[in-house]
Amino acid sequence: MSFVFNEAEFKKESEEFYSTYPADVSEIENELNQRYEKEKVSAMVQKKWTYEAIAQKCKVKVFRYCPFYSEVITGRDRNSVAGAFPPIPGLGCWALRTHYPVKEFDDWRKPYVERDLLFAEMMTDHSHHYADVERVLYDGFEKIRKEVSEMKAESTEEQEFKDSMLAACDALIALGYKFSEEADRMLQTEKDDSVREQLIRIRDTAGRVPRLPAKTFYEALTSVWFTRELCTAMEGSGFAVMGHYDRILYPYYRKDIEEQRITKEEAQNLIDCMMLITEARWKHNENTSGTNASVVIGGCDREGNIIYNEVTEMILNSFEKYEVSSPKLQVRISSKHPDKYKKHVALIAKLGRNCLSILNDDVLIEAHHRAGKKIEDCRMYLAGGCQEPVLSNECNSRAFMYLNLPLLLDAMLFPKELDFWSKENLRISRVDTAQNFEQFYESVVYNTAQFLAMCAVHYYRFEQIWSEINPMPLYSATMKSCIEKKTEITKGGAVYNSTSFSLIGIGTFIDSLYAIKKTVFEDRKYTLEHLKEMIKADFQGFEADRQYLMNKLPKYGQPDAGVDKLAKQVFHDLAKHSSGMPNPRGGYYEASLFAFYFYDVVKENTWATPDGRHAGQRISRGCNPSETSENIDAATLMNSLRSIDMAEYPGCGVTYLEMPVSQTDTDVTLFEYVLSAFVHCGGSALDFNVVDKDKLIKAKENPDQYRNLVVRVCGYSAPFISLSEELQDEVIQRALRNG
């Protein structure tokens, strides 16, 4: 059975269908509400009811021009490919909505969020999860159900968990049959032979896969996609990680080729269609922050064998062919990968396919191993969303709380005006009594550690609420350890259970500390009180001093031994004090440095900083230097990573690289050099944003002519014309500054 991907018809069909979303499921939801009002059961039982209602009462959609099936009409938003918080419409979030908002959490976070010290919308991460699709691929839900049925429940809680997992397995099996029946119904009237061929394939497959293990390349793709999509639709959470596709799919492809069941051309068509599903669903002008959906390629297997095969090449071919912002391509790379792989990845970057993240295996595997995880498990890491790493047997909570480091430093300089301390009865170490920079820095580190520890104490309780308002038994069923431990995923059922606070503005933070070190304690150019006076005035009346601070002092990212030494110390101390605190799932905090777009969001209330930055200006992104730093090109940016041990950051530290060059004139060798330098210099994660500054300016003036121009904003990708005018200007300014 062959398949030729008709991109135009698929996109047209998808747009016609998804433009009607969200579907009205109020009748089903009202029935659930009435039942809940009468019985007031636990959230776990609510999820069981949800699965049963979806399986029994929701319709399914089979697309004529797509061979994959997964669309269950649960009432969720069109733009809900990998996120579900705040609770979105649809039955998957019904249980969560009945318990939302959580006053305890909202009351605590409000003063910090209002002043932009924290960006904290969620009690825990609702977007960056990985259901173990590989287990479903090999075992199927029928076998998983059997394992659940053999679980010996010894309490009411365990029995409810068991019953809900059984209901989840039953629901997915029943929905598979529904897709088979719908395809058969459509066959009664379908006249197009090529469409009929795909409907027959769906009819004959959906009742078996993923109920049973996949046997072919097509079935493997279908099983992986179906599982991930149904988890997103039914769990009220986001499953950003689609899977490590080239590693898990290659054995099926090789077997099909050997048995002449498939041609390479048809396999490429199937991959092309799969890579365009999330893009076809998403409507960018409604939400520019991207889908989060991510495909992982490269890397290695459990034994450390390098992954690079024909499926890797086919996935790269798709990204070479199509200008999409989704899914994101998470490229695992190391010093051991072949040059052919690096060259193809470099070509994707050169073409401006700005949905690309590079993950350095040499650093990230070591980072997770240092965190106490088995080396064979560390080798199996994935990533999703922006770049958030997660092991295949791990439930992490990342990218849910962001700490504004520059504003925290200002709060130490102005503890009365920016009082983030008394609310928590924190006794801070006064920085204004320091006799030298060493004492000043010790106070800064102590206060930062106190604040992080305080946040971890509060979030210990907030993470406990997770299981009370939105347990995830379907997700749990895909994790073998949850069944073995008889523990639901949000309570610690995974093998590894990590949490991370995201620290933003580290470049601005380092530059500010260095400015204090140099001008106050070494050169005695200013007293600390005078510097504070300038900061409080936003440098009004002190422009000459601001220019000195901005342009005469070396900055992080520029080649300077003094700044490099301080940067190394700051990175180390922040990693140390944002790691190791316990979470309620039996795991610990891990250090991370990524920004999403919150480096921009928090600027409004971030005071001026000692490096000469004006109040209201953006702070630095990820591991990057300050946005105002000059003369920092790709080479100096890579070199700045040499002195920093990024393996102290299991949650990864992201370097964002603007390459303002014409996509037609630049040799791909430049991008190969950047990739090699990034790995050699010990970077953790790298985001490319390859843009033509002239094209950006033209796109802003004539948006209809540049609908396919995709840019990397910061962790997420989006069509340039979908961005707000302010963000468009910011992307243009980055290109101009680095050009």
Positions of PLM-derived features:
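Extended, non-transmembrane alpha-helical coiled-coils
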Residues: 174, 178-181, 185
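Conserved catalytic cores of very large enzyme subunits
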Residues: 1-162, 194-201, 205-739
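Extended non-globular scaffold/tether segments
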Residues: 163-174
